Protein backbone atom coordinates (compact mmCIF):
# COMPACT_ATOMS: atom_id res chain seq x y z
CA UNK A 1 0.00 0.00 0.00
CA UNK A 2 1.48 3.34 -0.97
CA UNK A 3 1.54 6.47 1.16
CA UNK A 4 0.33 9.98 0.39
CA UNK A 5 2.08 13.09 1.63
CA UNK A 6 -0.30 15.43 3.41
CA UNK A 7 1.06 18.27 1.30
CA UNK A 8 -0.25 16.45 -1.82
CA UNK A 9 -3.70 15.43 -0.59
CA UNK A 10 -5.64 18.43 -1.94
CA UNK A 11 -4.57 17.56 -5.49
CA UNK A 12 -6.31 14.18 -5.11
CA UNK A 13 -9.83 15.51 -4.47
CA UNK A 14 -12.23 13.79 -6.87
CA UNK A 15 -10.00 10.74 -7.37
CA UNK A 16 -10.54 7.17 -6.25
CA UNK A 17 -7.85 6.51 -3.65
CA UNK A 18 -8.41 2.82 -3.11
CA UNK A 19 -10.45 -0.35 -3.18
CA UNK A 20 -10.40 -2.77 -0.27
CA UNK A 21 -9.93 -6.51 -0.22
CA UNK A 22 -13.04 -8.66 -0.51
CA UNK A 23 -14.70 -9.66 2.77
CA UNK A 24 -17.05 -12.65 3.06
CA UNK A 25 -20.04 -11.97 5.28
CA UNK A 26 -21.04 -15.38 6.61
CA UNK A 27 -23.77 -16.34 9.05
CA UNK A 28 -21.29 -16.59 11.95
CA UNK A 29 -20.27 -12.93 11.43
CA UNK A 30 -23.92 -11.88 11.25
CA UNK A 31 -24.74 -13.79 14.44
CA UNK A 32 -21.82 -12.22 16.32
CA UNK A 33 -22.96 -8.77 15.22
CA UNK A 34 -26.52 -9.58 16.30
CA UNK A 35 -25.23 -10.60 19.72
CA UNK A 36 -23.10 -7.46 20.06
CA UNK A 37 -25.94 -5.12 19.07
CA UNK A 38 -28.88 -7.11 20.52
CA UNK A 39 -30.53 -7.00 17.08
CA UNK A 40 -31.79 -10.55 16.58
CA UNK A 41 -34.44 -9.83 13.96
CA UNK A 42 -35.18 -13.08 12.12
CA UNK A 43 -34.12 -11.71 8.73
CA UNK A 44 -30.56 -11.71 10.11
CA UNK A 45 -30.31 -14.73 12.42
CA UNK A 46 -32.84 -17.29 11.18
CA UNK A 47 -31.96 -18.30 7.59
CA UNK A 48 -34.87 -20.75 7.26
CA UNK A 49 -37.49 -18.30 8.47
CA UNK A 50 -35.93 -15.50 6.41
CA UNK A 51 -36.17 -17.73 3.32
CA UNK A 52 -39.82 -18.51 4.03
CA UNK A 53 -41.09 -15.15 5.27
CA UNK A 54 -38.94 -12.39 3.76
CA UNK A 55 -38.40 -11.15 0.21
CA UNK A 56 -34.64 -11.78 0.53
CA UNK A 57 -34.56 -15.53 -0.06
CA UNK A 58 -32.59 -16.11 3.13
CA UNK A 59 -30.77 -14.29 5.90
CA UNK A 60 -29.17 -10.91 5.23
CA UNK A 61 -26.51 -8.89 7.02
CA UNK A 62 -27.49 -5.97 9.18
CA UNK A 63 -27.02 -2.70 7.32
CA UNK A 64 -25.00 -1.46 10.28
CA UNK A 65 -22.70 -4.49 10.02
CA UNK A 66 -21.94 -3.52 6.44
CA UNK A 67 -21.35 0.07 7.56
CA UNK A 68 -19.09 -1.08 10.42
CA UNK A 69 -16.92 -3.03 8.00
CA UNK A 70 -15.82 0.25 6.41
CA UNK A 71 -13.11 0.49 9.08
CA UNK A 72 -11.39 -2.71 8.00
CA UNK A 73 -12.03 -1.85 4.36
CA UNK A 74 -10.27 1.45 4.95
CA UNK A 75 -7.24 -0.30 6.46
CA UNK A 76 -6.97 -2.80 3.61
CA UNK A 77 -7.72 -0.50 0.71
CA UNK A 78 -6.68 3.05 1.41
CA UNK A 79 -3.23 4.58 1.17
CA UNK A 80 -1.97 6.07 4.40
CA UNK A 81 -0.95 9.67 4.98
CA UNK A 82 2.80 9.57 5.45
CA UNK A 83 2.90 12.02 8.37
CA UNK A 84 -0.34 10.90 10.08
CA UNK A 85 -0.14 10.04 13.77
CA UNK A 86 -3.76 8.84 14.09
CA UNK A 87 -7.12 8.84 12.37
CA UNK A 88 -10.49 9.53 13.98
CA UNK A 89 -14.03 9.05 12.70
CA UNK A 90 -15.95 12.32 12.58
CA UNK A 91 -19.18 10.97 11.11
CA UNK A 92 -21.20 10.13 8.06
CA UNK A 93 -23.53 12.07 5.77
CA UNK A 94 -26.03 10.58 3.34
CA UNK A 95 -25.73 6.93 4.40
CA UNK A 96 -27.98 4.84 2.15
CA UNK A 97 -28.51 1.09 2.32
CA UNK A 98 -29.19 0.30 -1.33
CA UNK A 99 -29.19 -3.51 -1.56
CA UNK A 100 -29.31 -6.30 1.02
CA UNK A 101 -26.16 -8.33 1.61
CA UNK A 102 -27.12 -11.99 1.62
CA UNK A 103 -25.35 -14.48 3.85
CA UNK A 104 -22.22 -15.77 2.11
CA UNK A 105 -21.82 -12.67 -0.08
CA UNK A 106 -18.50 -10.94 -0.57
CA UNK A 107 -18.24 -7.16 -0.30
CA UNK A 108 -15.53 -4.56 -0.74
CA UNK A 109 -15.27 -0.80 -0.42
CA UNK A 110 -14.31 1.91 -2.90
CA UNK A 111 -13.09 5.25 -1.59
CA UNK A 112 -13.15 8.55 -3.52
CA UNK A 113 -11.69 11.62 -1.80
CA UNK A 114 -14.41 14.27 -2.01
CA UNK A 115 -12.97 16.99 0.22
CA UNK A 116 -10.06 17.92 2.48
CA UNK A 117 -9.66 20.96 4.70
CA UNK A 118 -6.96 22.01 7.11
CA UNK A 119 -8.75 22.69 10.42
CA UNK A 120 -5.92 23.41 12.85
CA UNK A 121 -2.16 23.17 12.84
CA UNK A 122 -2.32 19.40 13.30
CA UNK A 123 -5.79 18.46 11.96
CA UNK A 124 -6.84 17.68 8.40
CA UNK A 125 -10.53 16.92 7.89
CA UNK A 126 -11.19 14.62 4.94
CA UNK A 127 -14.37 13.37 3.32
CA UNK A 128 -14.74 10.27 1.18
CA UNK A 129 -17.57 9.11 -1.02
CA UNK A 130 -17.63 5.43 -0.12
CA UNK A 131 -19.42 2.63 -1.91
CA UNK A 132 -19.67 -0.92 -0.60
CA UNK A 133 -20.07 -3.22 -3.59
CA UNK A 134 -21.42 -6.76 -3.53
CA UNK A 135 -19.59 -9.26 -5.72
CA UNK A 136 -21.59 -10.15 -8.86
CA UNK A 137 -24.35 -7.63 -8.07
CA UNK A 138 -25.21 -4.54 -10.12
CA UNK A 139 -26.28 -2.36 -7.19
CA UNK A 140 -24.10 -1.55 -4.18
CA UNK A 141 -24.90 -2.52 -0.62
CA UNK A 142 -24.45 1.03 0.59
CA UNK A 143 -23.19 4.48 -0.24
CA UNK A 144 -22.15 7.21 2.18
CA UNK A 145 -20.03 10.28 2.66
CA UNK A 146 -17.51 9.41 5.39
CA UNK A 147 -15.89 12.29 7.24
CA UNK A 148 -12.63 11.60 9.05
CA UNK A 149 -9.95 13.51 10.87
CA UNK A 150 -6.28 12.93 10.16
CA UNK A 151 -4.09 14.09 13.00
CA UNK A 152 -0.41 14.65 12.46
CA UNK A 153 2.57 16.29 14.10
CA UNK A 154 2.28 20.09 13.63
CA UNK A 155 5.88 20.31 12.35
CA UNK A 156 4.91 17.98 9.46
CA UNK A 157 1.64 19.68 8.59
CA UNK A 158 0.79 20.64 5.02
CA UNK A 159 0.84 24.29 4.10
CA UNK A 160 -2.60 25.82 3.51
CA UNK A 161 -2.94 26.54 -0.14
UniProtKB/Swiss-Prot annotation:
Q: Which InterPro entries match?
A: HotDog_dom_sf, MaoC-like_dom, NodN-like
Tell me what gene encodes this.
nodN
The keyword Cytoplasm appears for this protein: no
Q: What is this protein called?
A: Nodulation protein N
Q: Look up the domain of life of the source.
A: Bacteria
- Species this chain originates from: Rhizobium meliloti (strain 1021)
Q: What is the lineage of its organism?
A: Bacteria, Pseudomonadati, Pseudomonadota, Alphaproteobacteria, Hyphomicrobiales
Belongs to which family?
To the R.leguminosarum biovar viciae counterpart.
Q: PANTHER family of this UniProt entry? A: MAOC-LIKE DEHYDRATASE DOMAIN-CONTAINING PROTEIN
This chain's function reads: Involved in the production of the root hair deformation (HAD) factor specifically on medicago.
Q: Do you know which SUPFAM superfamilies this protein is assigned to?
A: Thioesterase/thiol ester dehydrase-isomerase
Keywords from UniProt, A to Z, are: Nodulation, Plasmid
Start and end of every MaoC-like domain? 10-130
Q: Which Pfam families match?
A: MaoC_dehydratas
Gene3D superfamilies found in the cross-reference section = Hotdog Thioesterase
Amino acid sequence: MHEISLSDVSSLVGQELGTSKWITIDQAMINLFADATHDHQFIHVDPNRAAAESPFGGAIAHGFLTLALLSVMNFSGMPKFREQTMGINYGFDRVRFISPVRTGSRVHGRFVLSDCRLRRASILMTAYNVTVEIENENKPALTANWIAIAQFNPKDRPKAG
